[in-house]
Curated annotation (Swiss-Prot):
The keyword Nucleotide-binding does not apply. Belongs to the CEP63 family. GO terms for molecular function: identical protein binding. The gene is DEUP1. InterPro entries: Cep63/Deup1_N (IPR031470). One of its GO terms (biological process) is multi-ciliated epithelial cell differentiation. It is found in: Cytoplasm. Key structural component of the deuterosome, a structure that promotes de novo centriole amplification in multiciliated cells. Deuterosome-mediated centriole amplification occurs in terminally differentiated multiciliated cells and can generate more than 100 centrioles. Probably sufficient for the specification and formation of the deuterosome inner core. Interacts with CEP152 and recruits PLK4 to activate centriole biogenesis. Interacts with CEP152; the interaction is mutually exclusive with CEP63. The modification Phosphoserine is found at residue 547. It comes from Homo sapiens. This is Deuterosome assembly protein 1.
Length: 604
């Protein structure tokens, strides 16, 4: 009865402790699941935001590519128009040169003819009066043709002015785009500063988490949480670095595009200058054409005078002189308008000089901005390199700490197994002591019984001392990872008390058996040896008994059944935790592969 009560008293605190441990484990697992779910949601939201940012950046790039294509088309069209204009002007120049050469020859002939006519007397004036209207009509037609040409040139001048206005508008748009890019660069700098602050916060949280132990959670779970946090921080740093590199490349490409556009604008300005020079040349050519018209008039008069007789030439000499004088007056009036054209040309030249000065100042400003951006890029690369080095050092330190903790866990598991083996031995020894009746106990060989008892007691003492030493070492080192260390000490004390009670029972039995030694004959030692062979003692390597106990001891059976159920639950919990950890690792690998593919697509 005393042994049964002692067994019930021994199993009840163990059951309570195990139930408390199971409840704590369930609470910890539920808390861990909630934390993981929150982290996964936060990661999903971040991924969605990053995807949206990538889509926005892609749309911006597409828009900029379309703008570049439109600008290229405009440049091609302008080049084609300029080529066509130059070809037309060259053809007109060649035709005007040919006409000028003809007019010079005719003028020389007219001059010689007039010199001859001055020597000859004037006669037959009425015949020439009939031919004068015909000559005047021809001259009027030629004047109208030249006026039409002057109108066309005026229209071309208006077109060139509109083209200059459009170029000014394009320059304004380019300046606005440069300002927008500066604002974007400032926003990127603010984002970088925010990320640096986040990194500093994470770096300050890491030693705090390492130094402050949480009594409600296990050390392995805390270490896994810290490792996952560091991995996420390293991934965010790598992603931010790649983003910054891509954005810097985009900015450099856009700056190159703007430099090309500036060069194209310079080429357009040079073309406008050449067009203005060609316009000056055209004005000069117009003046030459007017002179040529005058010479043609003189030539026509020579031809008509040559066809007629000398008398008719003498009579028509006076009116033919009056008409060229009138034409000369008209030409002088046209020459008076020439200073106005020169003033307009001077104004256009001054405007072009102002545009060139403004363009040069903008180029210098853009160069200064490019140099500033390059310096900022170098500084950012240096900071990123330092952050990566710090992250690598932290990863190494965490790996070393994890290895040390895994070794300590392995040692502690071995000590737990040994403690369980000793506890099962103690329970089976109690069962054996209760199973032996006083009559049978007196009939056994006393010497064999004492030897087996002493060997079992010595073994239990040795195992208990070894377990105590292991627990003392773990307590001194201060690196235990389980929160229920006090339970091990209590179980050790309980085992020691049970051992003392077993010794007291054996001493009492020995005192009872001493007066009956002389009366009872010694029996052969086969009975006790058979009993020893069937006894459920546990070896040093096994955790559970080799043979089940007798049905007459329900307390030992209940304890064994309870231990088996607890082991099954522990194994199931381990399996669940391992499966959950594997799922998390697969998910992280999937996300990493996804982002690596996105990075590769960006680089392509």
């Amino acid at each position: 009865m005393e042994n049964q009560a002692h067994n019930t008293m021994g199993t009840s605190p163990c059951e309570a402790e195990l139930q408390e441990l199971m409840e704590q484990i369930d609470i910890m697992v539920s808390n861990k699941k909630m934390d993981w779910e929150r982290k996964m949601r936060a990661l999903e939201t971040r991924l969605d935001l990053r995807d949206q940012e990538l889509a926005n950046a892609q749309t911006c790039l597409d828009q900029k590519g379309q703008e570049v294509g439109l600008l290229r088309q405009k440049l091609d069209s302008l080049e084609k128009c300029n080529l066509a204009m130059t070809q037309n002007y060259e053809g007109q120049l060649q035709s005007l040169k040919a006409q000028f050469s003809k007019l010079t020859n005719n003028f020389e002939k007219l001059r010689l003819h007039q010199m001859k006519q001055n020597k000859v007397p004037r006669k037959e004036l009425p015949h020439l009066k009939e031919e004068i209207p015909f000559e005047l009509s021809n001259l009027n037609q030629k004047l109208e043709e030249f006026r039409a040409k002057s109108r066309e040139w005026d229209k071309q001048e208006i077109l060139y002015q509109t083209h200059l206005i459009s170029l000014d508008a394009q320059q304004k748009l380019l300046s606005e785009k440069c300002n927008q890019f500066q604002k974007q660069a400032q926003s990127y700098q603010t984002q970088l500063n925010g990320k640096k602050q986040c990194l500093e916060d994470s770096s300050s949280e890491i030693p705090r988490l390492i130094c402050d132990p949480d009594p409600n959670c296990e050390i392995n779970e805390r270490d896994e949480f810290i490792i996952e946090k560091l991995k996420s921080a390293v991934n965010e740093i790598a992603l931010s670095r790649n983003k910054l590199q891509d954005e810097n490349q985009k900015l450099l490409q856009e700056l190159k595009m703007y430099q090309r556009q500036c060069q194209a604008m310079e080429a357009g300005l040079s073309e406008v200058k050449s067009e203005l020079q060609s316009r000056d040349d055209l004005l000069r050519i117009i003046e030459m054409e007017r002179l040529q018209l005058h010479r043609e008039l003189l030539k026509i008069g020579e031809c008509q005078n040559a066809q007629g007789n000398k008398t008719r030439l003498e009579s028509s000499y006076l009116p033919s002189i009056k008409e060229p004088e009138r034409k000369i007056k008209e030409l002088f009036s046209v020459m008076q308008d020439q200073p106005n054209h020169e003033k307009e040309l001077n104004k256009i030249r001054s405007q072009l000089q102002q545009v060139e000065e403004y363009h040069n100042s903008e180029q210098e400003r853009m160069r200064n901005e490019i140099s500033d951006l390059t310096e900022e890029l170098h500084q950012k690369e240096i900071t990123i390199a330092t952050v990566t080095k710090k992250a690598a050092l932290l990863e190494k330190q965490l790996k070393m700490e994890l290895e040390i903790k895994e070794k300590m866990l392995a040692k502690q598991k071995v000590s737990d197994m040994k403690y369980k083996a000793v506890r099962t031995e103690n329970t089976h020894l109690k069962g054996m002591m209760g199973d032996l009746d006083p009559g049978e106990y007196m009939s056994m060989d006393f010497t064999n019984r004492e030897q087996s008892r002493h060997t079992s007691i010595n073994k239990l003492q040795y195992e208990n001392e070894r377990l105590r030493n292991d627990l003392a070492k773990l307590h001194v080192n201060g690196k235990s990872t389980w929160t229920n260390q006090n339970t091990y000490e209590e179980t050790g004390r309980y085992a020691y008390q049970s051992q003392i009670k077993v010794e007291q029972n054996e001493e009492r039995l020995s005192h009872d058996c001493e007066p009956n030694r002389s009366t009872m004959p010694p029996l052969p030692p086969s009975t006790f040896q058979a009993k020893e062979m069937t006894s459920p003692l546990v070896s040093d390597d096994d955790v559970f008994p080799l043979s089940p106990p007798d049905m007459s001891f329900p307390a030992s059976l209940a304890a064994q059944h309870f231990l088996l159920e607890e082991e099954k639950r522990a194994k199931e919990l381990e399996k669940l935790l391992n499966t959950h950890i594997d799922e998390l690792q697969r998910h992280t690998e999937f996300t990493l592969n996804k982002y690596s593919k996105l990075k590769q697509n960006r680089h392509i």
